[in-house]
């Protein structure tokens, strides 16, 4: 599987692909807005990890976040890129997106693993994310710890806050 993909930071000309993938992977109440996605890619492309299908040259999925010294996930991270401190000791993961045709092949796990290794090498201490109840077990298999119900009410949903310690 790994040999079929190139893993790297996102390129500015891939913003439209990222927006389209986000809208496929998340319902409208949870998806990142095109404006916020464009701002994230413009400001911190290095905090994206994309998986490019070598056979098509197109994005198959990606993981993105914002760096901060904060230790608690809050909804404003989704919408306010100015909260990002590129030198922050932690990363708040904002979205793990894998197109449906690439699911079930271990790509999500590979993205989380490679992202965590890269950010650990960059001096990050912890990765945080929020997820719905039905995704908790998947993220536990990826090595994250469930911290319980999050303060987040993003999209009108109840979320679990999870952490991966470096």
Segments (PLM) and residue ranges:
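Residue-level recognition of the GNAT/N-acetyltransferase active site
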Residues: 11, 99, 132
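Active-site rim helix/loop that mediates acceptor-substrate recognition in acyltransferases
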Residues: 27-55, 62-83
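Conserved acyl-donor/pantetheine-binding loop and adjacent beta-alpha core of acyl/acetyltransferases
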Residues: 58-96, 103, 153-158
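Conserved GNAT acetyl-CoA-binding A-motif
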Residues: 112, 118-132
């Amino acid at each position: 599987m790994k040999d079929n993909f190139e893993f790297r930071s996102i390129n500015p000309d891939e913003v439209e692909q990222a927006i389209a993938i986000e809208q496929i992977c998340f319902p409208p109440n949870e998806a990142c807005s095109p404006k916020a996605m464009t701002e994230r890619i413009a400001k911190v492309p290095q905090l994206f990890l994309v998986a490019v299908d070598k056979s098509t040259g197109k994005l198959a999925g990606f993981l993105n976040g914002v760096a901060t010294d904060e230790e608690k996930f809050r909804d404003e991270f989704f919408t306010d890129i100015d909260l990002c401190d590129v030198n922050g000791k932690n990363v708040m993961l904002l979205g793990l997106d894998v197109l449906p045709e690439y699911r079930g092949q271990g790509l999500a796990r590979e993205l989380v693993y490679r992202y965590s290794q890269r950010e650990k090498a960059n001096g990050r201490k912890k990765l945080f994310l929020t997820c719905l109840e039905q995704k908790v077990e998947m993220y536990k298999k990826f090595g994250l710890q469930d911290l319980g119900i999050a303060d987040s009410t993003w999209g009108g949903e109840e979320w679990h806050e999870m952490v991966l310690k470096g």
